[in-house]
A protein has these predicted regions:
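Structural and coupling elements of P-loop NTPases
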Residues: 1-616
Length: 616
């Protein structure tokens, strides 16, 4: 009979962005008294990265452990966004069950689908938590039906379809097995009990030879690279001589210098660990995700973890604009290269191709969000760099060129559905489903080429006056769609001079389009200062000051009034970029510019490009 470790449960918490997953983990930590009562629990304690707290999303998978009635529950908090799906897949290997958190109003979303599919593929036991039950608009019964439909659609087996449901309000710290909000108890005990009763305990085969697989990486200046993962078999102690089976089939021997266990939000040093434990190991600088650690006399690697390939790439290069070096600490090409290579130490979904010239680096990731988070992180660390427009990665599958397609789910007021359907049809999207979800809202589901979505979210927000919600996730590679993908790109207003933008100049040119800079902003020749109302680029002089004369004008006492400029965020700037433009990123500024700054040289290059296109 198989021996089990009844004192442990390993679970992952999965959910769509913003359905309350991290808040739920915070509450479980608080109610299990894992966190010191004197330390005031920081809201969203599991999101330790500044960007995660600001954006309210989880980017990196985290692990923590809580003790409940003598059982240790290891909880993996996973990202809910497909751009960080590389993290999700690996965590599924470390756990025996999943807690699926679903919003009591929004129900199942594309991300829920993406993450749940990964969990069911690994044969994990699911538990469903319907969160935000206290919302006036909550519809728990319908949401549970939607979840069941999704399980059936994703091919869940009979055991997985018998999932238990707990209803909760994580923010209030209440839960219950009843879907009536009035029955909510001021405790998370129903969730803890359901986890212990339904999630299988890990197999205790600690007397067999060690097998430990690395699922996540961390880096520490004192001990170097750290491999985080699960012991599938055997026992490991500090000082053990072990063998690392590399991805390429080679092996390396090393001594375990430190072992870490997880207690609450802390990582503490331990002396030994056995089958079923989630731990971190240090001692091998060259360790990578998917590799297996075994005893030197019994090398038996586990199957390598497959990581989804990147779907989007962009060029990174050192800043060479006229304002280069003014605002950043790290401005050279070598510094940018070192930082990108350092990112590869922990982010396995990222690819960096240094290219022959070493000046330009092709960086590939899982989506716009994945790459924009990297750019924002580098900017905050004091780097100056320039990036090109994102482009999708074309793959050849069985001799056919294929491009990535995304599954898009849109919730919008009914009156905007016509213009959305038209816009996505122009971008070669196919509508898969359309349903009314009450309150005058329509849910639309499309399959759209990923390149058709680059730059679409800003257009979508203005099209729906900010009332629409769009979520999309990578679906599959399909043959490349012929022809141009719609979504007309408007031209840019390009500065033809260097200096400071003046109110007088902005007043004269604002009727030509939308201005991106405030009066007094320093600009340079070739910098984009606005969006043209037409499709062509237009050179403008934004630095002219009003001529002073000693003649009193009849309009002398009029005050200059200009429209508020549209200051672009990092994501909006990326979406605005055209093929011949760069986004310049520094710790203090985000600027858009033409790759060729001089207008005459730019015109010559465009002519050459046009001739070459005609010759083809």
């Amino acid at each position: 009979m198989t021996k089990l470790r009844e004192d442990i449960r390993n679970v992952a918490i999965i959910a769509h962005v913003d359905h309350g997953k991290t808040t739920l983990v915070d509450e479980l930590l608080k109610q299990s008294h894992t966190l010191d009562e004197r330390k005031e629990l920081d809201e969203r304690a599991m999101d330790s990265n500044d960007l995660e707290k600001e954006r309210g999303i989880t980017i990196l998978a985290k692990n923590t452990a809580v003790a409940y009635n003598g059982t240790r529950i290891n909880i993996m908090d996973t990202p809910g966004h497909a751009d960080f799906g590389g993290e999700v897949e690996r965590i599924m290997k470390m756990v025996d069950g999943v807690v699926l958190v679903v919003d009591a109003y929004e129900g199942t979303m594309p991300q829920t689908r993406f993450v749940l599919k990964k969990a069911l593929e690994q044969n994990l036991t699911p538990i469903v938590v319907v969160n935000k039950i206290d919302k006036p608009s909550a519809r728990p019964e319908e949401v549970v039906d939607e979840v069941l439909e999704l399980f059936i659609e994703l091919g869940a087996d009979d055991d997985q379809l018998e999932f238990p449901v707990v209803y909760a309000s994580a923010i209030n710290g209440t839960s219950s097995l009843s879907d009536n909000p009035a029955d909510q108890e001021h405790t998370m005990a129903p969730i803890f009990d359901t986890i212990i009763d339904h999630i299988p305990a890990p197999v205790d085969n600690s007397d067999e030879p060690l097998q430990f697989q690395v699922s996540l990486l961390d880096y520490n200046d004192f001990v170097g690279r750290i491999g985080i993962g699960r012991i599938f078999r055997g026992t490991v102690k500090v000082g053990d001589q072990v063998t690392l089976s590399k991805l390429d089939g080679t092996t390396k021997n090393f001594r375990v210098t430190k072992l870490f266990g997880f207690f609450g939000l802390e990582r503490r040093e331990i002396e030994e660990a056995k089958a079923g434990d989630l731990i971190a190991i240090s001692g091998m600088e060259d360790i990578f995700v998917g590799e297996t650690i075994t005893p030197t006399d019994a090398v038996e690697p586990l199957p390598v973890l497959r990581i989804d390939e990147p779907t989007l790439q962009m060029t990174f290069l050192a800043n060479n604009s006229p304002f280069a070096g003014r605002e950043g600490k790290h401005v050279t090409s070598r510094k940018v290269e070192e930082r990108l290579l350092a990112e590869l130490q922990t982010d396995v979904s990222l690819r960096v191709d240094l290219g022959g010239r070493r000046i330009i680096k092709k960086v590939s990731g899982r989506g716009e969000l994945h790459l924009s988070i990297l750019i924002e992180t580098m900017r905050r660390e004091g780097y100056e760099l320039q990036v090109s427009r994102p482009e999708v990665i074309i793959k050849e599958i069985d001799g056919v060129k294929c491009e990535p397609f995304e599954r898009v789910q849109i919730d919008t007021p009914e009156e905007y559905q016509g213009s959305i359907i038209q816009a996505l049809s122009e971008r070669k999207g196919d509508m898969l489903d359309m349903q009314m979800v009450g309150n005058g809202q329509t849910r639309l589901i499309f399959l759209v080429p990923a390149r058709g979505l680059i730059g679409f979210s800003t257009e979508f927000l203005s099209m729906t006056r900010g009332y629409g919600i769009m979520n999309h996730t990578f679906d599959q590679y399909l043959p490349v769609v012929a022809g141009e993908i719609g979504g007309g790109h408007r031209g840019a207003l390009v500065s033809i001079d260097t200096g400071k933008a003046t109110t007088y100049s902005i007043m004269r040119i604002e009727e030509r389009g939308t201005i991106f800079v405030n009066p007094g902003t320093e600009v340079y020749e070739g910098m984009i200062v606005g969006e043209n109302a037409r499709e062509n680029d237009l050179g403008v002089n934004i630095t002219t000051a009003k001529q002073m004369t000693n003649v009193r004008s009849a309009t002398k006492d009029q005050t200059a009034v200009i429209k508020t400029p549209r200051i672009l965020t990092l994501e909006e700037s990326l979406e605005f970029l055209d093929d011949d433009e760069y986004m310049e990123v520094t710790p203090e500024s985000i600027r858009l510019r033409k790759q060729i700054l001089n207008k005459a040289e730019r015109d010559k290059a465009n002519k050459r490009k046009k001739k070459a296109a005609e010759a083809e």
